[in-house]
C-alpha cells in the first residue's frame, strides 16, 4: 500500500472488503484520508478501534453512489481477495465505478486462473468462490461495470495471483503491453478453449492417483503418515482424494481453535504441532503446499529421525 501512495499520491483511498483495517492502517499512518467498506459489523468495529474509518455495507451501485456523495470520489479504490466472492459481478463492478474518481484508479487482487491450471492447484477451488479469473475474463467483467483494464501485475500470493489495474472506461487511458502479453499466455495455455479445461481435469486426476498410491503404499509398508496444517485447501484435497484416518493418522495446526476437532468430511483429527516431534512419523504431508519454502525450513527437524516431507501439488514430491 505504501508503494501505491508513493506512486499515485492519492488524496482519498477507499478499500472494499477492508476487513479489520490492516491495509488501510498503512494509509492512515501516511496521513492520507481513507475509508473502509466492510460488510461484517464486528470486523468493521475492530477497524474503527484502530483508527480506520469504516462503514458497514455490501458494495452495490447504490452504496457506491452514496459513499461518493457523502465522502467524495476516491482517487484509488482497492478490492483485494473479494472479486471472486461476488455473485453479482456487474453490480459490484458498477459499485467500484461509482466510488472512483473520473480520473482515478481501481486495484483488484484475485487468484490467477492461469497459475491454478498450470500448477494443478485444484485444491484452491472453494465453494465460496463464484468465479476464477483469467486476465481475459477479468477484462470483460470490468468492462461490464464501466471500467477498463489498463495494467496487470503477476503476484506470488495464494499460489499465483494477479493485481488488476483499471480506470473509468470513458477516460480512454492507455493500456499496458503486459495486458496483451498475459492474455496471449492464457490463450496458449488453453484457457480460452474448452479443451484446455479437459486437460486440466486429466492432470488433476493423475495428481489424485499419485497421492493415493503413495499413501496406500506407505500403509502397506507399515510407515506412518501425518499431516501438517488444516487449511481450507487441505480440506478440498482430502475430500477429493477420499483421504481418511486409515491413510492419514492425523494432522496438526498452529491454530488452537482447531485442536481437538476434525477435518470436515474426512474426520482426520487435528492436534497441536508438537505432536509431530513426539510421534516422529515417517512422512509429513504438507497441506499448505504454497508455503513450501517456509515450511521446509520450519519442519527441518523431521529429518532428525529420518522423516520426510510430502508435497502433493503441483505433483507429488517427497523431500
What does each model-found stretch correspond to?
Residues 9-19, 224-228:
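Conserved class I S-adenosyl-L-methionine
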Residues 20-32:
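Conserved SAM-binding loop of SAM-dependent methyltransferases across substrates and taxa
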Residues 51-66, 269-270:
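Conserved SAM-binding strand-loop segment of SAM-dependent methyltransferases
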Residues 75-78:
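A conserved beta-strand element that flanks and buttresses the S-adenosyl-L-methionine
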Residues 90-105, 300:
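A short glycine-rich, Lys/Arg-flanked "PGG" loop and its adjoining helix->strand segment in the class I
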Residues 103-111, 307-314:
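Conserved beta-strand signature within the Rossmann-like core of class I S-adenosyl-L-methionine
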Residues 106-131, 135-138, 142:
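Short, glycine-/aromatic-enriched active-site segment of Class I SAM-dependent methyltransferases
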Residues 158-203:
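Flexible, glycine-/basic-rich loop-and-beta segments that form/coincide
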Amino acid at each position: 500500500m505504501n508503494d501505491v501512495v508513493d506512486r499515485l499520491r492519492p488524496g482519498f483511498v477507499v478499500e472494499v472488503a477492508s476487513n479489520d483495517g490492516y491495509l488501510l492502517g498503512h494509509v492512515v499512518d501516511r496521513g492520507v484520508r481513507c475509508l473502509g467498506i466492510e460488510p461484517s459489523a464486528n470486523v468493521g468495529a475492530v477497524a474503527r478501534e484502530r483508527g480506520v474509518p469504516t462503514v458497514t455495507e455490501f458494495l452495490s451501485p447504490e452504496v457506491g453512489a452514496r459513499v461518493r456523495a457523502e465522502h467524495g470520489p476516491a482517487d484509488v479504490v482497492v478490492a483485494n481477495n473479494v472479486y471472486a466472492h461476488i455473485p453479482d459481478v456487474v453490480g459490484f463492478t458498477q459499485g467500484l465505478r461509482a466510488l472512483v474518481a473520473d480520473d482515478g484508479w481501481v486495484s483488484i487482487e484475485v487468484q490467477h486462473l492461469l497459475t491454478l491450471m498450470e500448477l494443478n492447484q485444484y485444491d484452491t477451488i472453494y465453494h465460496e468462490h463464484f468465479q476464477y479469473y483469467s486476465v481475459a475474463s477479468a477484462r470483460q467483467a470490468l468492462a461490464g461495470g464501466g471500467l477498463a483494464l489498463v495494467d496487470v501485475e503477476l503476484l506470488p500470493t495464494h499460489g499465483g495471483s494477479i493485481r488488476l489495474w483499471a480506470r473509468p472506461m470513458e477516460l480512454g487511458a492507455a493500456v499496458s503491453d503486459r495486458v496483451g502479453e498475459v492474455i496471449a499466455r492464457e490463450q496458449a495455455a488453453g484457457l480460452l478453449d474448452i479443451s484446455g479445461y479437459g486437460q486440466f481435469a486429466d492432470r488433476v486426476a493423475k495428481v489424485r492417483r499419485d497421492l493415493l498410491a503413495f499413501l496406500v503404499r506407505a500403509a502397506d509398508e507399515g510407515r506412518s503418515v501425518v499431516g501438517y496444517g488444516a487449511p481450507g485447501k487441505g480440506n478440498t484435497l482430502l475430500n477429493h482424494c477420499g483421504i481418511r484416518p486409515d491413510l492419514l493418522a492425523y494432522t496438526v495446526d498452529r491454530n488452537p481453535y482447531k485442536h481437538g476437532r476434525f477435518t470436515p468430511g474426512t474426520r482426520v483429527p487435528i492436534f497441536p504441532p508438537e505432536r509431530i516431534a513426539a510421534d516422529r512419523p515417517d512422512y509429513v504431508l504438507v497441506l499448505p503446499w504454497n508455503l513450501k519454502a517456509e515450511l521446509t525450513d520450519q519442519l527441518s527437524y523431521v529429518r532428525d529421525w529420518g522423516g520426510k516431507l510430502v508435497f502433493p501439488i503441483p505433483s507429488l514430491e517427497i523431500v
